[in-house]
C-alpha cells in the first residue's frame, strides 16, 4: 500500500473539510510521496484525494527533508501567503489544523 497508516488517517480526516469549512481558493493541499509508495497503488489512490500530488525520487525527497527539517511522516509544512514557511507537526492535531488554516485563510 502507499503512504503510512497515520498519513492515510490524516488524509481521511481532512478530506471532508476541504469541501466545507476549509474550502478556499487561497488554500492549496499538497501531498508528497516518495518512491517507497508503489506507483500503481499511488496512482489508484490520488484521484480520490483533493489537492496537488507529487511522487518524488530519492534525491528530491532528501532535498525536501533537508530543506524543511523533516525527520518523519506525516509532516506538515505551512506555507503562508507571503512565502514564509514553517514545519508544523503540531498540525497532526486535526482541531488545531482546522483552526490554524481558518486563521490563515482569513488573513
Name these PLM-found stretches:
Residues 53-57:
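Short acidic-hydrophobic, aromatic-tinged amphipathic segments that line or gate anion-handling sites
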Residues 8-47, 59-66:
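Structural microenvironment flanking redox-active thiols in thiol-disulfide oxidoreductases
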Residues 1, 32-34, 81:
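Cofactor-binding loop segments of dinucleotide-utilizing enzymes, especially the Rossmann-like FAD-
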Residues 104-106:
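Short, hydrophobic alpha-helical segments
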Residues 5, 59-102:
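Thiol/disulfide oxidoreductase modules built on the thioredoxin-like
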Residues 1-5, 9:
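Active-site beta-to-alpha loop of glycosyltransferases that engages the nucleotide-sugar donor
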